[in-house]
Amino acid sequence: MDQSAVHFAHRFDNVSGSAIREIFKIIAQPGMISFAGGNPSLNALPDRLVSELAVDVLAQNGKAILQYGATEGYAPFLESLHAYAANMLKCEIPAVLPVTGSTQAMDLLCKAMIDPGDTILVENPSFLGNLQCMKLYQANLVPVESDGDGLLPDDLEAKIRQHHPKMLYTIPTFQNPTGKTLPADRRRRIAELANEYHVVVAEDDPYRDLRYTGSPLPSIKSFDTDGWVMFLGSFSKIISPGLRVGFMAGDPSIIRKCTVGKQSTDVHTANLNQAVVDQFIRRGLLPGHIASICAEYGKKMKLMLDQLSAFPGGVSYTKPEGGLFIWAELPENISALDMLTKAIDKKVAFVPGTHFCVGGGHENTIRLNFSNSTEDQIITGMGILKDLIAEAIR
């Protein structure tokens, strides 16, 4: 094929492949210690339990569970999901829609609401996958200022007045990539601003259950009085990313539009996978499984934080209460991209923070993942990074 004769859609003009996916090609090398991804630990994936539940589901439903299903979702799962979401969010949930991973929920929201040139306010830095999704819909991305606790409501209101956005995208709990958690008073204020200015809030909360210290906080959705907050949830981090089951919860009119959009995207989320997650919920298996995951991840996070405490002066880092990530800031004269090249030579990988930032910048920041490494790998890999940073400072 003559590549010069291929005319791709303009929506791809400003969208490149995920930098993380490119790094994944590198971390596949034998012996590589990777702090780069966001994968669950293999120990956390309940393969035997999923197998047992799938066998039970097939025995109970026969071939029907392998047939096409309703876009709105597998009926038993809709029932258990509605109760699960209401209990988790501590508020009335008027409508839910199962989706094929919570990233699809963001895609459907953009498909339903965003025209080319519409403005979406975003935390900066933010989750790269959904930033790419917004760019594919040719949205104008405007960053909102943050501090050590996350998004600043005063700057949010100023940006709303200035840019008249259609949507705000936020990850309020153990944010990806920073690990920060938004305080309850800011969550309340965001909901108030959404209702006052009629801005849809996409509250993306896939790490909510991965809490190792501290107490749970109310969702932004729980403060929503007029239906402007859409909650995006996921079972990828607490059961399995391979099942590709997530959900969105919120205003019925938005759910209906997203359902229409889903019909032309994948028809429906796999019935068998919905049924397996349904059984996780109905049989009360989630609390014990989540507790087991949190025990493992909490230990690994503490170990990585302990290693960071021995890093050279000039290195600062977040101290999350949960989630999968720690965000570190190196001295300003150190390029994380250059550091990555040297680290890969020593069989250690991470993601430079600039890849998560709207408009670039933050060249001296890195995101570190601890969930998918062994304790020995954390000690060895962090020791290598410490030595590389010390060498760069000298």
Please place each PLM-identified region on the residue numbering:
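Conserved glycine-rich beta-strand-loop-beta hairpin in the small C-terminal domain of fold type I
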Residues: 278, 295-305, 316-329, 339
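Short, conserved charged micro-motifs
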Residues: 334-339, 376-380
